[in-house]
């Protein structure tokens, strides 16, 4: 259907020897003019052995569309940790704050309050076990 938006965001937090694979797929059909489609894959690597593979894909069969994609993969920003520690936060607390901020970009878009609270609970539980 034309004149619609599609926003696909995938976020991964990887530790140990974990590996994520993102293979995005957006198809814009012939009669879907006016579509705005976007794919984003962001990964936060908590260890030197974690891996993230990204392969965004678009199949566009009409004109008059806007499609974009992006990917980012990296570790926690050491400058951000230093800044928080200079404000009296421990290194572990700083890492948790930054991970929460990374996840919040997705959780904040959830409109269902029950689901949002559950997701926040899951994140906090995982952070407690880091």
Functional labels for PLM-detected ranges:
Residues 1-130:
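Active-site gating/interface segments in enzymes
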């Amino acid at each position: 259907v034309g004149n619609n938006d599609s926003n696909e965001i995938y976020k991964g937090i990887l530790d140990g020897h974990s590996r994520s694979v993102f293979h995005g797929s957006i198809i814009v059909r012939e009669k879907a003019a006016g579509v705005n489609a976007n794919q984003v894959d962001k990964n936060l690597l908590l260890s030197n052995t974690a891996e993230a593979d990204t392969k965004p894909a678009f199949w566009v069969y009409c004109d008059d569309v806007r499609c974009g994609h992006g990917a980012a993969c990296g570790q926690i920003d050491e400058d951000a940790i230093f800044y928080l520690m200079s404000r009296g936060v421990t290194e572990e607390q700083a890492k948790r704050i930054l991970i929460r901020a990374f996840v919040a970009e997705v959780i904040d878009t959830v409109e269902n309050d029950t689901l949002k609270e559950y997701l926040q609970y899951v994140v906090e539980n995982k952070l407690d076990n880091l």
